[in-house]
């Protein structure tokens, strides 16, 4: 069952988790940050995510203003996803998670992520 919070009464951390705390959401944002912008690329980069779950996460991220969808083909409809200003700002959270993970849980082996974190 999905969590629901009264965001008016909760701390900022709880409100943030209400948006990005579902399984896979942060990883989808990570991969869009790394340049995986098409649905098929995201499906491959998030190994193990189901198609319906990826669609759900992208839809929610779009509704919450983290990503925008741009169609590059009408027939069949094909879209790319890009971070909005709000999504770009979330990179700071990704960097903090990356730093914490490498400090406390071992060395980084993901070069593209390390390069992304050096930017901005």
What is each PLM-predicted segment?
Residues 91-120:
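Amphipathic alpha-helical dimerization/coiled-coil segments
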Residues 11-53, 74, 82:
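N-terminal helix-turn-helix DNA-binding core of bacterial DNA-binding proteins
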Residues 54, 58-64:
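Basic amphipathic alpha-helical segments that dock to polyanions
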Residues 36, 46, 58, 87, ...:
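Short amphipathic alpha-helical/adjacent loop interface patches that line ligand
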Residues 7, 72-73:
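Short loop/turn motifs at secondary-structure junctions and domain boundaries
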Residues 21, 73-97:
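Basic, amphipathic "hinge/linker" alpha-helix immediately C-terminal to the N-terminal HTH DNA-binding motif
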Residues 1-11, 19-23, 45, 57, ...:
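Recognition helices and adjacent regulatory flanks at domain boundaries
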């Amino acid at each position: 069952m999905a969590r629901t919070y009264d965001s008016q009464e909760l701390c900022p951390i709880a409100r943030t988790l209400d948006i990005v705390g579902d399984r896979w959401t942060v990883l989808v944002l990570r991969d869009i940050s790394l340049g995986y912008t098409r649905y098929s690329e995201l499906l491959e980069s998030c190994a193990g995510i189901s198609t319906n779950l990826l669609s759900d996460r992208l839809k929610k991220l779009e509704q919450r203003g983290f990503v925008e969808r741009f169609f590059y083909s009408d027939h069949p409809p094909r879209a790319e996803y890009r971070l909005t200003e709000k999504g770009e700002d979330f990179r700071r959270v990704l960097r903090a998670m990356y730093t914490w993970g490498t400090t406390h849980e071992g060395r980084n082996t993901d070069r593209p992520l390390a390069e992304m974190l050096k930017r901005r």
